[in-house]
Amino acid sequence: MSHAIKTALIWAGIYMAIEIGIVLVGYSHDPRVHVIAFGVNSLCLLLAVAVSIVTNFNKKKHEGVSLVVDLKTGITTSAIYALTIACFLLVYYKWIDPEYPEIRKQQWIEMTETNKFQDGVDQTIKNNPEIYYGKSSEDIRDNEQAGINMLLNSNKVFLISLLALLVLGMFYSFLVTAFNRLVLAKLG
């Protein structure tokens, strides 16, 4: 098994352990914790890509590693990480915590019915009258709630997380490769 794949699986395992830890501690339905978990997921992906690219570069720098090899290593790592995490999220939302989508839906619906949300919608309509011509704040709230139903389907969560992590992983691959070539390679 290549180093890129091992690195991806190790960092995906770290993220999954953190998610399971959140469930075991009892914070799995707190929306603020999911924002933090999203940040941890992004950080684990970044660290997986960085460790993979830098380690591969340092291991093979005497052979003259090309830029394409660095990018390929990073993208391979991010693809394995993304697929692993997307599958984990599918399993999580279908079998580990199947009531979470309904709980999250209720939290979002309650949020859309607050005065703060109403004031934000009214301000948005006022600032962009041509975009929201003929629409009321109730129409916008109903659209938000319809979008919530669509996004909380476990199959859609799988697809969205897979695509988002793949795109983010490619971006991280370019970023880490550039940083490695421009800064780290000059230092070492």
PLM regions and their residue ranges:
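Juxtamembrane loop-helix boundary motifs flanking transmembrane segments in multi-pass membrane proteins
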Residues: 1, 59-67, 143, 147-154
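Alpha-helical transmembrane segments of multi-pass membrane proteins
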Residues: 6-10, 14, 72-81, 160
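Individual transmembrane alpha-helix segments
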Residues: 133-167
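Alpha-helical transmembrane segments of multipass membrane proteins
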Residues: 14-22, 44, 48, 81-89, ...
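Transmembrane alpha-helical insertion/packing segments
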Residues: 1-64
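Hydrophobic secretory-pathway targeting helix
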Residues: 57, 67-93
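Juxtamembrane interface at the cytosolic side of transmembrane helices
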Residues: 58, 168-188
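Functional transmembrane-helix hotspots
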Residues: 88-128
